Curated annotation (Swiss-Prot):
Principal cellular location given in the protein's record: mitochondrion
Documented EC number(s): 2.7.8.7
The keyword Lipid biosynthesis is annotated on this UniProt entry: yes
Coiled coil: none
Family stated for the protein in its record: Belongs to the P-Pant transferase superfamily. AcpS family.
UniProt xrefs under Pfam families: ACPS (PF01648)
Protein name per UniProt: Mitochondrial holo-[acyl-carrier-protein] synthase
Key words, A-Z: Fatty acid biosynthesis, Fatty acid metabolism, Lipid biosynthesis, Lipid metabolism, Mitochondrion, Transferase
Gene that encodes the chain: PPT2
Presence of the UniProt keyword Plastid in the record: no
Domain of life: Eukaryota
Amino acid sequence: MSVLGVGCDVVHLPRMHRLLTKYDAGSRGFQRVVSKFMHPTERIALGVDGASLSAGQIRYIAGTWALKEAALKALHCAAPLHTVLPPAMFIYTKLLYRQRRSNGVPQLLLDNEALRLDQLQFLRQAKFLSTLSHDNEYLVAYTTLIDTKNLV
């Protein structure tokens, strides 16, 4: 196993709360905001069923944003020289999606459909290790992109 890249991101939760509560959770404005960085799988997992968001839903959205920002930084470390990565919006909404493991730990997965792009072939044998932590006001995400070729 070798480390290909590392990334970190910090989100100020009150700022994310202000951004997300500008719109009713079921509105087109809200959908427009989250569709810029959330994979369809994540939007389904979010489970918006009313006009307002719970504190847990806001943390979920903030955590998703932070994980993807951290992952983008790791990807830029890992991309082979002269490789032009797809735009960030493609990476956020098509390539990466967040799921929880059975123990509740978040994981970032690579969408196999998006991995068909030539410039993403270097990720075919890679995976992200991820962690989130938060307190009342801040949420931090760390990601490590590893090569799984030689994993036992």
